[in-house]
């Protein structure tokens, strides 16, 4: 039997290593968590099970003799007088070990849960590993069956994967065109369904007016997007009805950027210091038709971020908060940003850095899943030219144009199918 150990960052990568080296017939003997990932033990070519042992007549004779002697001793013990039996019980009682002290009992009681906890943790890890193994195997089987039974659907799956769309969004889209026989027609219908799934505001937020804040992680492009929106507004409505507000006193030079923008556009700028009431800061701007707020991109664990989000969520202010998402970010980064900033109440999102993005599927999928209207698309550094009001069909067309040129690998497709078997809590991540 050939036994090997494999090391990888996660279970799926480890399974890929096993399949590549030992083939699909390899058996998984065990898995455990190690520094940096997973250790998987796999084997190939199990030896045949050992043949059953032959009967040993001599041993059977000795066993029968021993059994007879035990029966004789038991009968003799039963026939002995009661007094002798009482003395024997006393003798045996003296030989019993002493009862543990209270301190020893307490120590043992505390030790048991610790061992139990360690055992439960080990069992939990083993179960998680088994679940991931099952997911990988099911994904591989399901993908293989789809290619064999429905090659057209498999081709559409590949195209959606090239766009960066996750399995949980691709599956319902493909179900809508499952009965369409022509591949080209099915693809056009699929993109139409995808376009309808992308929500956009009925009215340009700048035309609607009010108080609008841009929130999101550091580096998403909040300040640059705010500058584009401010310039766009001034060109259409003039500078008299616009005011700029900066809540970013943490990043070096952030407020200076807003001040410079205000001077260029001839627009008043209000700086909100930490601890200052946002309600009081906005009170003098009540007559302005449009107020744009730039916020700080702080770590999710920073208490200052919680205070900032609570201020923006105040019902008395009626702030429309838009999540700024860089389309260059990974799916997990986008999901984490949404989970952090959703607490302030999001009116929609703005997608930035489209000119640098490798795909748009991840950001589109988040907007669709969370029902976030996509307000604007920012695709360059020019102010205000590189900011467009979002149109769902244009966004989908751009996503198609950015799809990866190469076909996804079989392992990538199997892994995507494996995601369909994950528990909802794990998919949410």
From Swiss-Prot:
Mode of membrane association: Peripheral membrane protein
Compartments reported by the entry: Cell membrane
Keywords on record: Bacterial flagellum biogenesis, Bacterial flagellum protein export, Cell membrane, GTP-binding, Membrane, Nucleotide-binding, Protein transport, Transport
GO terms under cellular component: plasma membrane
SMART domains according to UniProt: AAA (SM00382), SRP54 (SM00962)
InterPro entries: AAA+_ATPase (IPR003593), FlhF (IPR020006), FlhF__GTPase_dom (IPR047040), P-loop_NTPase (IPR027417), SRP54_GTPase_dom (IPR000897)
Cross-referenced CDD domains: FlhF (cd17873)
Domain of life: Bacteria
Protein name: Flagellar biosynthesis protein FlhF
Annotated source species: Pseudomonas aeruginosa (strain ATCC 15692 / DSM 22644 / CIP 104116 / JCM 14847 / LMG 12228 / 1C / PRS 101 / PAO1)
Gene: flhF
């Amino acid at each position: 039997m050939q036994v090997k150990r494999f090391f990888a960052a996660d279970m799926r990568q480890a399974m890929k290593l096993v399949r590549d080296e030992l083939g699909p017939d390899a058996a998984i003997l065990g898995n455990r968590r190690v520094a940096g990932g997973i250790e998987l033990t796999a084997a190939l070519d199990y030896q045949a099970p050992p043949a059953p042992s032959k009967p040993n007549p001599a041993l059977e004779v000795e066993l029968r003799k021993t059994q007879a002697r035990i029966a004789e001793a038991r009968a003799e013990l039963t026939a002995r007088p009661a007094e002798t039996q009482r003395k024997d019980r006393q003798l045996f009682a003296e030989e019993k070990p002493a009862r543990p002290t209270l301190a020893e009992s307490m120590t043992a009681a505390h030790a048991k849960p610790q061992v139990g906890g360690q055992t439960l943790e080990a069992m939990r890890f083993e179960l998680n590993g088994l679940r991931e193994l099952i997911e990988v195997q099911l994904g591989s089987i399901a993908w293989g069956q789809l290619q064999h039974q429905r090659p057209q659907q498999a081709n559409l799956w590949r195209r959606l994967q090239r766009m960066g769309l996750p399995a949980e969004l691709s599956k319902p889209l493909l179900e809508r065109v499952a009965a369409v026989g022509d591949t080209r027609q099915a693809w056009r219908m699929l993109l139409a369904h995808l376009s309808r799934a992308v929500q956009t505001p009925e009215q340009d937020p700048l035309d609607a007016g009010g108080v609008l804040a841009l929130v999101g992680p550091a580096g998403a492009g909040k300040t640059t997007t705010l500058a584009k929106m401010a310039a766009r507004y001034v060109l259409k409505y003039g500078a008299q009805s616009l005011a700029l507000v900066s809540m970013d006193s943490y990043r070096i030079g952030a407020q200076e950027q807003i001040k410079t923008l205000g001077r260029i556009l001839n627009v008043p700028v209000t700086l909100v210091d930490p601890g200052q009431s946002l309600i009081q800061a906005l009170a003098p701007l009540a007559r302005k038709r449009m107020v744009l707020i730039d916020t700080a991109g702080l770590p999710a664990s920073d208490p200052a971020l919680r205070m900032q989000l609570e201020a923006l969520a105040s019902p008395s202010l009626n702030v429309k908060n838009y999540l700024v998402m860089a389309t260059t970010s990974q799916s997990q980064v986008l999901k984490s940003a949404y989970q952090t900033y959703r607490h302030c109440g999001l009116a929609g999102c703005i997608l930035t850095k489209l000119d640098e993005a490798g795909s748009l599927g991840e950001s589109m999928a988040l907007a669709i899943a969370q029902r976030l209207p996509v307000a604007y698309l920012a695709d360059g550094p020019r102010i205000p030219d590189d900011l467009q009001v979002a149109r769902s069909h244009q966004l989908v067309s751009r996503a198609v144009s950015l799809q990866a040129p190469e076909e996804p690998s079989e392992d990538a497709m199997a892994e995507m199918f494996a995601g369909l078997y994950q528990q909802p809590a794990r998919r949410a991540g």
